[in-house]
Amino acid sequence: MTAESGPPPPQPEVLATVKEERGETAAGAGVPGEATGRGAGGRRRKRPLQRGKPPYSYIALIAMAIAHAPERRLTLGGIYKFITERFPFYRDNPKKWQNSIRHNLTLNDCFLKIPREAGRPGKGNYWALDPNAEDMFESGSFLRRRKRFKRSDLSTYPAYMHDAAAAAAAAAAAAAAAAIFPGAVPAARPPYPGAVYAGYAPPSLAAPPPVYYPAASPGPCRVFGLVPERPLSPELGPAPSGPGGSCAFASAGAPATTTGYQPAGCTGARPANPSAYAAAYAGPDGAYPQGAGSAIFAAAGRLAGPASPPAGGSSGGVETTVDFYGRTSPGQFGALGACYNPGGQLGGASAGAYHARHAAAYPGGIDRFVSAM
């Protein structure tokens, strides 16, 4: 077919008629331009107000309810009651608006939360309008606010003052504390939360007795801390102050009351009682045998004595031993004569059999990790 045998092109008048018919059909289908919520420029229009809804914001409704209250404060239930009595729209519609009222009360600084008095019946706190926010609406009209109110200092508002009952309770608590701690002088409780308790003197407690550390010792002894005024036993007294701050033991001719402990790195003569430190010291290379007149060997931070076994005897068939302080007592544990070496292992002759048995059962070489072939 050629172009001449085809249908003729439509006339402009026919195209205009078709466009008008299509627009009428769309309008008859209920899709007008206003129903889409868009204007001629394509921008979305503001949602229209619901029929019968008051033109006041939730902040204005709350401020209106508080302003009409006799005491200029209301509970949350009182605010609900005022709004539903004054505006029937909120009485007939669902209660979703109550959530908005609660949110505006807690999120806006222009509303103050006042605790309920102790003797007042009912429940819930009171809500009041901040005194500095009374002029936030222009010319007393609740239709428009000047600007958002921001609270500067919480401690400057009288709404946060404690009531008389709370003040009396605080005074009673302060009196009770003064009776328990006579030396304490607590200041009056500040009326606002977050304030600093100034002027409080803590009770004067007796200081604990100081721990005795000799002057020449590079570090404190790891066995005991001695108080010079109170020796541990009648045989042991405060450490003598030797020349140059020496912390050595007293000589054999000194009285027993001048015997003291030997701190780290100190050596000296044996005390007057030869059986006061009858215990063996097992060092890294074995036990160190020491005679009755030899000096005491002391490792860093530990007390040691001669390597002789605990002195004692038998009296009437009962074996007696000498304890750490040189006092005689029945020896219930006579077999435990060895002590521990610095490595945490048992030393002495009594521990040799123990180590021999465990060395056979648990070899310490590499063969313990190789299975038998």
Curated annotation (Swiss-Prot):
InterPro entries from the xrefs? Fork_head_dom, FOX_domain-containing, TF_fork_head_CS_1, TF_fork_head_CS_2, WH-like_DNA-bd_sf, WH_DNA-bd_sf
Query: Entry's Pfam families?
Result: Forkhead (PF00250)
Q: Which residues bind DNA?
A: 53-147
Does the keyword Transcription regulation belong to this entry? yes
Keywords, alphabetical: Congenital hypothyroidism, Disease variant, DNA-binding, Nucleus, Phosphoprotein, Transcription, Transcription regulation
In the record, the effect of residue 73 to S is given as: In BAMLAZ; no effect on protein abundance; no effect on sequence-specific DNA binding; enhances transcriptional activity toward TG and TPO genes
Q: Which GO terms describe its biological process?
A: anatomical structure morphogenesis; cell differentiation; cell migration; chordate pharynx development; cranial skeletal system development; embryonic organ morphogenesis; hair follicle morphogenesis; hard palate development
**What PTMs does it carry?**
Phosphorylated.
The tissues where this chain's protein is expressed are given as: Detected in adult brain, placenta, lung, liver, skeletal muscle, kidney, pancreas, heart, colon, small intestine testis and thymus. Expression was strongest in heart and pancreas.
Gene Ontology CC annotation, any one: nucleus
Q: Where in the cell is it found?
A: Nucleus
In the record, what terms sit under GO molecular function?
DNA-binding transcription factor activity; DNA-binding transcription factor activity, RNA polymerase II-specific; RNA polymerase II cis-regulatory region sequence-specific DNA binding; sequence-specific DNA binding; sequence-specific double-stranded DNA binding
- Which PROSITE patterns does this entry report, sorted A to Z? FORK_HEAD_1, FORK_HEAD_2, FORK_HEAD_3
Region Disordered, annotated ranges: 19-51
Q: Which domain of life is it from?
A: Eukaryota
Q: Compositional bias (Basic residues) spans?
A: 41-50
Describe what happens upon changing residue 65 to V: In BAMLAZ; loss of sequence-specific DNA binding; loss of transcriptional activity
Linked pathology is: Bamforth-Lazarus syndrome: An autosomal recessive disease characterized by congenital hypothyroidism due to thyroid agenesis or thyroid hypoplasia, cleft palate, spiky hair, with or without choanal atresia, and bifid epiglottis. Thyroid cancer, non-medullary, 4: A form of non-medullary thyroid cancer (NMTC), a cancer characterized by tumors originating from the thyroid follicular cells. NMTCs represent approximately 95% of all cases of thyroid cancer and are classified into papillary, follicular, Hurthle cell, and anaplastic neoplasms.
Q: What does this protein do?
A: Transcription factor that binds consensus sites on a variety of gene promoters and activate their transcription. Involved in proper palate formation, most probably through the expression of MSX1 and TGFB3 genes which are direct targets of this transcription factor. Also implicated in thyroid gland morphogenesis. May indirectly play a role in cell growth and migration through the regulation of WNT5A expression.
Q: What protein does this entry describe?
A: Forkhead box protein E1
